């Protein structure tokens, strides 16, 4: 197993380039199941979760050719509609093949998901919506067994609560359904906008893209001709490097981003007294004379993303005063707190609210353990300003979602090395 060794207190400067968004790429790869042609995807991030999902496409009978950050996928040869536990257990996003497989073939079996260690994410909302579209669904021996022998039927779907994965699954299912599907209380994330735009550019009639009401006219099980596209930039990776600049209080330019997608993060950095310069496809963080405390509530897009709260918690340890973070979306999403405490942070938990008493220079390097993807990035940020050396173990979590993290950090001046455990 590998770990990261980070020596804190180094000056960072220059610029960093952001990769394609993992959370956009995963549903887009699932979407290729709806295609009749070879599909070219560019700006694909080279991270473990993407490679796992491509393996799943292979297991289903599809094929792909990958070169650096581009992949050509052909799913016309799919002859297996079972997504088995061995792959699904490592990544919850595997559930995204459920909608497209069922819509295309009229039957599929998908193992109940594993992956993230950040609380329950029940797939009930996905299943209820598919049942409203005419599917018969049973859960047997850990598998979702879904059938719709005559194809899925368009329906009015009202999600009880906003669900990103549920919206993605139903958008894809609706693309091949018979008739019109209306999704009410749809998620509005940029990743969902791109999924809808790719389908629309491929001939599927979709209205309401980027709103909470999406209307999709299905093709009646006719496969679609999916045009080539590039994955949008990763707003969470961008936000993480913005926090790297802020926590070290140095100037850093972050290239290949869509600033509109970063509005909530930019707003909170400005509240913390940082100036953020914006260009068409870059943002620059400027240092401040005082890092001010901040109060954050996580919520659905366009609000503050839950995937950024761990990084802002690390940043808040360096603020002059008391910050709060109210996690409204997931339970068990404060597992990084115990590790930040090992570094010397002053953090108190009360249910889903964390109170952080900040003080610049308060952290000291030691051994810590990553517990999930975003928690591990918080530990990296904390290590950048901790006195001495920090060893971050179980960094396979980082590799799930950050492309070449130590390489990018080294290029901007951080002292980061990857080593093997003895």
Curated annotation (Swiss-Prot):
EC numbers on record: 2.5.1.7
Active site: 116
Residues at which UDP-N-acetyl-alpha-D-glucosamine binds: 92, 121-125, 307, 329
Location in the cell: Cytoplasm
Positions contributing to phosphoenolpyruvate binding: 22-23
Gene Ontology CC terms: cytoplasm
Gene Ontology annotations of biological process type: cell division; cell wall organization; peptidoglycan biosynthetic process; regulation of cell shape; UDP-N-acetylgalactosamine biosynthetic process
Family: Belongs to the EPSP synthase family. MurA subfamily.
The protein, known as: UDP-N-acetylglucosamine 1-carboxyvinyltransferase
Source organism (scientific name): Aliarcobacter butzleri (strain RM4018) (Arcobacter butzleri)
Gene that specifies this protein: murA
